[in-house]
């Protein structure tokens, strides 16, 4: 790392003391770069937080699976540990019994992160709201204000980025792994064969239903257990534009087949003489073509119910879900359009964004983006450059998705994403295990994931060494 200059000693401002902001702060000061961390809690609260502690966990106390061999979020844990993440280090220290998951004592965890950062000689914590974009003399800023970004700052970001580039609700449709769809029942075709290329004319996977299947599906949708909006979500005025599929079903049994499930402009090559009563369409969700989302299927069904109901769709009986659906109060940017590969706002490169605000979902994913934002900003301040982590790593796959790997297909197409193996470049399927035995059947999937994880950690080590 180059010798620190006077410019390097100028502090970097981090706005937001949640998971991403706390991690970004730690990564910066670990490189010798001073930080002013701005956190409004303690002066102004939010509708969901209960304390003024840094890295407060407002929902679950789980960081999800800690299995780094066959689980993508577990792999992300391991990568972050190897990069000296304060969130993972203090998470491990506050660990509770949770089987293969990493669950933490939320109070112990938040208090430990707060103590470590507040006592660090290079950290200044400023308890104040930043109600607008930072002043021009703040030449390097990381904005990590999360899903409950204050109204005034949200308005300032909206003004800078343009109408429609900042969302206030996510409307998440379920996403399935392409290789788990039964193409003996489903087929590729765009409505009315629209498109200039063969790929465009076959851009959608179509799952047909006859009348009995459709009626049973509607019954299941209406009967399924739903999650209720929290009071602070229900009172947010941006919800009307993204109705859950079950609400559409409740408004009329024919509503869906005249909406997202309309069976027009499509012919089933498996049964061309029979017109489907309804059709569920899946659209490619990432550039690799490994993930497909269910078009128009944002939902408030509980996760367990989603699996049961959605596997009633012909062709999805054995579907594996990379992401289940949901609708939540959220604030996030259209990052693939607005941010560069180093998380800088293209229109104002002095501003970096991190955490849920850039369109990742989950505590660990948010902290991971804070980790990268902090490292990028530190390198820049110190006159160095930092190449992005390889796309084969969990960190690289996730940042690649939010800054360019997602396919932009119209307003609202970019929605928050958890880390999952569908974001990674494919790998050749292992054929034998460590003992030389042939890998068969259900053992193939964990073997492929283990190979992806091994590749990721090897490539991460090379990136660190470089």
Swiss-Prot record:
Q: Does the keyword NADP apply?
A: yes
Subcellular localization is given as: Cytoplasm
Q: Which GO terms describe its biological process?
A: tRNA methylation; tRNA wobble uridine modification
Write out the residues that bind FAD.
16-21
Say where the protein is mainly found: cytoplasm
Give the protein name, as stated in the record.
Answer: Methylenetetrahydrofolate--tRNA-(uracil-5-)-methyltransferase TrmFO
The UniProt catalytic activity note for this protein reads: uridine(54) in tRNA + (6R)-5,10-methylene-5,6,7,8-tetrahydrofolate + NADH + H(+) = 5-methyluridine(54) in tRNA + (6S)-5,6,7,8-tetrahydrofolate + NAD(+); uridine(54) in tRNA + (6R)-5,10-methylene-5,6,7,8-tetrahydrofolate + NADPH + H(+) = 5-methyluridine(54) in tRNA + (6S)-5,6,7,8-tetrahydrofolate + NADP(+)
- Gene behind this protein: trmFO
MF annotations from Gene Ontology: flavin adenine dinucleotide binding; tRNA (uracil(54)-C5)-methyltransferase activity, 5,10-methylenetetrahydrofolate-dependent
* S-S bonds: none
* EC numbers: 2.1.1.74
Similarity-based family: Belongs to the MnmG family. TrmFO subfamily.
Q: What is the protein's species of origin? A: Maricaulis maris (strain MCS10)
Which of UniProt's keywords are assigned here? Cytoplasm, FAD, Flavoprotein, Methyltransferase, NAD, NADP, Transferase, tRNA processing
The function of this protein is: Catalyzes the folate-dependent formation of 5-methyl-uridine at position 54 (M-5-U54) in all tRNAs.
Cofactors (names): FAD
Q: Which domain of life is it from?
A: Bacteria
NCBIfam families for this protein: gid_trmFO, PRK05335.1
Q: Name one GO cellular component term.
A: cytosol
Listed SUPFAM superfamilies = FAD/NAD(P)-binding domain
């Amino acid at each position: 790392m180059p010798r620190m200059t006077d410019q390097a000693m100028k502090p970097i401002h981090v706005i937001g003391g949640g998971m991403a902001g706390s991690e970004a702060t730690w990564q910066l000061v670990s490189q010798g770069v001073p930080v002013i961390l701005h956190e409004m809690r303690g002066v102004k609260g939010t509708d969901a937080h209960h304390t003024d502690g840094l890295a407060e966990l407002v929902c679950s106390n789980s960081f999800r699976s800690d299995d780094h061999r066959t689980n993508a979020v577990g792999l992300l844990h391991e990568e972050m540990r190897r990069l000296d993440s304060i969130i993972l280090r203090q998470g491990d220290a506050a660990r509770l019994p949770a089987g293969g998951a990493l669950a933490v004592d939320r109070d112990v965890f938040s208090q430990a992160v707060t103590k470590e950062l507040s006592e660090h000689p290079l950290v200044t914590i400023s308890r104040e709201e930043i109600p607008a974009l930072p002043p021009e003399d703040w030449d390097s800023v990381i904005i990590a204000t999360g899903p409950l970004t204050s109204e005034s700052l949200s308005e300032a970001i909206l003004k800078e980025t343009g109408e429609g580039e900042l969302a206030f609700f996510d409307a998440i449709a379920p996403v399935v792994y392409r290789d788990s769809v039964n193409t003996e029942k489903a087929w590729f075709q765009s409505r009315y064969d629209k498109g200039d290329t063969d790929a465009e004319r076959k851009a959608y996977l179509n799952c047909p239903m006859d009348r009995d299947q459709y009626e049973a599906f509607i019954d299941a949708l209406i009967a399924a257990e739903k999650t209720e909006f929290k009071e602070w979500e229900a009172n947010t005025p941006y919800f009307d534009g993204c109705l859950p599929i079950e609400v559409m079903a409740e408004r009329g049994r024919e509503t869906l087949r005249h909406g997202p499930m309309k069976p027009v402009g499509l012919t089933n090559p498996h049964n061309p003489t029979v017109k489907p009563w309804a059709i569920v369409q899946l659209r490619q969700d990432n550039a690799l073509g490994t993930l497909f989302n269910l078009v128009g299927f944002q939902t408030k069904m509980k996760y367990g119910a989603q699996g049961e109901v959605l596997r009633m769709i012909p062709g999805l009986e054995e579907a594996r879900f990379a992401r289940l659906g949901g609708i939540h109060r959220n604030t996030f940017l259209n990052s693939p359009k607005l941010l560069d590969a180093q998380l800088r706002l293209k229109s104002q490169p002095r501003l970096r964004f991190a955490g849920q605000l850039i369109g990742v979902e989950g505590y660990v994913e948010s902290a991971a983006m804070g980790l990268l934002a902090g490292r990028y900003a530190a390198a820049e301040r110190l006159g160095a450059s930092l190449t992005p982590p390889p796309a084969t790593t969990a960190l690289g796959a996730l940042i690649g998705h939010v800054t360019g790997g997602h396919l932009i297909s119209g307003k609202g197409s970019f929605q928050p994403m958890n880390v999952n193996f569908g974001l990674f470049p494919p790998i050749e399927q292992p054929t034998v295990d460590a003992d030389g035995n042939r890998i068969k059947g259900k053992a193939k999937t964990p073997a492929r994931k283990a190979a992806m994880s091994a590749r990721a950690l090897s490539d991460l080590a090379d990136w660190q060494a470089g």
